[in-house]
């Protein structure tokens, strides 16, 4: 590799997914070095309204946790806010939830995905917990993980989806595989007020055609 063709990433360096969170460079330059363009816009995401019927108990559970628990440790935030949402999703879609899913594409794209879901017909969703509750830098990490999924996958399907979350805030992202564009949604969804929309999108990604 010719070092002059890259803006910020060092061809001699090795980068794990979590390292992208700490890089001081712009997301535009990072994804350009990975071979993609970056965009930020309001996404028209797939939805699955049927999951509405399962909201009551989960809403009560999360509302209680938000009232009485102020987690400092990231593992606590995952266990009491993120995991219950994804467990409900996987039960509805009837698919396994993979946590700390190992993925290695090359020296720039390797590490563990916090949560990764893939259906039998290869619809995929990945979710990461934003370190330090920073959605902006968390999305840079998400972009790298979406790029890794794109490069690893040989199956059909034009779109890949992911989300970065603090537990109570969720932001979605999309990778267009044909255009090589990673798009960050401008909308941030809140739990519990917009839990229905979050679950509709998560289920829509896994149940509707890309």
Locations of the language-model features?
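A short, conserved, highly charged catalytic patch centered on acidic carboxylates
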Residues: 2-161, 169-210
């Amino acid at each position: 590799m010719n070092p002059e063709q890259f803006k910020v990433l060092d061809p001699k360096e090795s980068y794990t997914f979590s390292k992208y969170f700490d890089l001081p460079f712009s997301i535009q330059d990072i994804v350009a070095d990975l071979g993609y363009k970056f965009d930020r816009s309001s996404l028209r995401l797939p939805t699955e309204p049927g999951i509405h019927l399962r909201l009551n108990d989960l809403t009560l559970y999360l509302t209680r946790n938000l009232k009485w628990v102020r987690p400092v440790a990231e593992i606590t935030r995952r266990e009491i806010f993120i995991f219950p949402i994804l467990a409900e999703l996987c039960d509805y879609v009837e698919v396994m939830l993979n946590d700390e899913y190992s993925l290695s594409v090359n020296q720039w794209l390797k590490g563990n995905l916090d949560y990764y879901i893939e259906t039998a017909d290869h619809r995929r969703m990945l979710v990461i917990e934003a370190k330090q509750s920073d959605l902006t830098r968390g999305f840079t990490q998400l972009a790298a993980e979406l790029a890794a999924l794109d490069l690893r996958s040989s199956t059909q399907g034009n779109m890949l989806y992911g989300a970065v979350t603090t537990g109570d805030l969720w932001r979605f992202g999309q990778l267009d595989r044909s255009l090589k564009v990673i798009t960050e949604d401008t909308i941030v969804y809140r739990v519990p007020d917009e839990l229905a929309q979050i679950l509709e999108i998560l289920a829509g990604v896994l149940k509707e055609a890309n």
